[in-house]
Swiss-Prot record:
Family: Belongs to the thiolase-like superfamily. Chalcone/stilbene synthases family.
Annotated pathway: Secondary metabolite biosynthesis; flavonoid biosynthesis
Keywords (A to Z) from UniProt: Acyltransferase, Flavonoid biosynthesis, Transferase
UniProt xrefs under InterPro entries: Chalcone/stilbene_synt_C, Chalcone/stilbene_synt_N, Chalcone/stilbene_synthase_AS, Polyketide_synthase_type-III, Thiolase-like
Lineage of source species: Eukaryota, Viridiplantae, Streptophyta, Embryophyta, Tracheophyta
Function in brief: The primary product of this enzyme is 4,2',4',6'-tetrahydroxychalcone (also termed naringenin-chalcone or chalcone) which can under specific conditions spontaneously isomerize into naringenin.
Record-given protein name: Chalcone synthase 4-2
Enzyme Commission number, as recorded: 2.3.1.74
GO BP, one annotated term: flavonoid biosynthetic process
Gene this chain is encoded by: CHS4-2
Expression induction: By infection.
Active site as annotated: C164
EC supergroup of this enzyme: transferase
Catalyzed reaction equations: (E)-4-coumaroyl-CoA + 3 malonyl-CoA + 3 H(+) = 2',4,4',6'-tetrahydroxychalcone + 3 CO2 + 4 CoA
């Protein structure tokens, strides 16, 4: 007679969850940040709002973003004039767009990840899909299963409207699935199309202007599994420990609400301060068991909600400027892609580490941290261990 504990032990993997492949994708429409204010105020028929345009120009100039990729083109916006108005009912128009585009962009990233992984897609046992927009039934997880031709009995998990911290959430969930289901191979897809946040400029909705200056569209996909098959699967990062916490006294710091006008965001000015004030506690909890207290000795992947957050974290922890190099590079080249950002940074870091001839996927270092920040204010923490190149 086999005991329950024996059954449980047989179900568990031996080693830690490991990233086995990464793929990314963006819409073809590339927007230069330097000229975006002119385009934005012209397409929304707001060129007469000169003071507001100057304010928006300053936001874009300070964003540290060079370019972004956006699903919304001039043609799409002209075909849907209601979405360019200030708080006009436009949710139906947005929904029709994003319920198609979120799975489509996600498929593009997933195909790249599966190709790098090099295994048949029939070996995918679990699917985690995350997006901030396009709530629908059946959801984007169902649509992706169909688009990719995955087995109909793949175990699906759909996460809607979590916001910018969710890049950490999907890794936490993938880790638990991979480590507690022997042989599991988890396809993780974060597909973010921020069109639903687009609207015309208004003096009374300055929060919305921040989003117009920062948000970009992109999708990232990972294959996660424990106990990589030697000579066949190539590990990139190990996920060693995860945590999620709500920062104290942070209610209302970042809120998002789905309205007839689309998804509206509300931000407190002190969001960078709240993040930096709580970051040390999260690091101590994560790295004290490893005997690490010098946070310049680890590699960094932080959600780039904006340059002010990165600046204050650097200042609070006395981090060397190069610690946030990969994070700032992704912010500069893609903008804030919500949950997909940290996965893009993982990809950027492993590629740059190889190009620079470093010894590990984590900039030559062994240990690292991944942070997601978002509504709540919620902080996701993932301790990563790099792999020798």
């Amino acid at each position: 007679m086999v005991s329950v504990s024996e059954i449980r032990n047989a179900q568990r993997a031996e080693g830690p969850a490991t990233t086995l492949a990464i793929g990314t994708a963006n819409p073809t429409n590339c927007v230069e940040q330097s000229t975006y204010p002119d385009f934005y105020f012209k397409i929304t028929n707001s060129e007469h709002k000169t003071e507001l345009k100057e304010k928006f120009q300053r936001m874009c100039d300070k964003s540290m973003i060079k370019r972004r990729y956006m699903y919304l083109t001039e043609e799409i916006l002209k075909e849907n004039p209601s979405v360019c108005e200030i708080m006009a009912p436009s949710l139906d128009a947005w929904q029709d767009m994003v319920v198609v585009e979120v799975p489509r962009l996600g498929k593009e990233a997933a195909v790249k990840a599966i190709k790098e992984w090099g295994q048949p897609k029939s070996k995918i046992t679990h699917l985690i899909v995350c997006t901030t927009s396009g709530v629908d039934m059946p959801g984007a997880d169902y649509q992706l299963t169909k688009l990719l031709g995955l087995r109909p009995y793949v175990k699906r998990y759909m996460m809607y409207q979590q916001g910018c911290f969710a890049g950490g959430t999907v890794l936490r969930l993938a880790k638990d699935l991979a480590e507690n289901n022997k042989g599991a191979r988890v396809l993780v897809v974060c597909s973010e199309v921020t069109a639903v946040t687009f609207r015309g400029p208004s003096d009374t909705h300055l929060d919305s202007l921040v989003g117009q200056a920062l948000f970009g569209d992109g999708a990232a996909a990972l294959i996660v599994g424990s106990d990589p098959v030697p000579e066949i699967e190539k590990p990139i990062f190990e996920m060693v420990w995860t945590a999620q916490t709500i920062a104290p006294d942070s209610e209302g710091a970042i809120d998002g609400h789905l309205r007839e006008a689309g998804l509206t965001f509300h931000l407190l000015k002190d969001v960078p301060g709240i993040v930096s004030k709580n970051i040390n506690k999260a690091l101590v909890e994560a790295f004290e068991p490893l005997g690490i207290s010098d946070y310049n000795s680890i590699f960094w992947i932080a959600h780039p909600g904006g340059p002010a957050i990165l600046d204050q974290v650097e200042q609070k922890l006395a981090l060397k400027p190069e610690k946030m190099k990969a994070t700032r590079e992704v912010l500069s080249e893609y903008g804030n892609m919500s949950s997909a950002c940290v996965l893009f940074i993982l990809d950027e870091m492993r590629k740059k580490s190889a190009q620079d001839g470093l010894k590990t996927t984590g900039e030559g270092l062994e240990w690292g941290v991944l942070f997601g920040f978002g509504p709540g204010l919620t902080i996701e923490t993932v301790v990563l261990r790099s792999v020798a190149i």
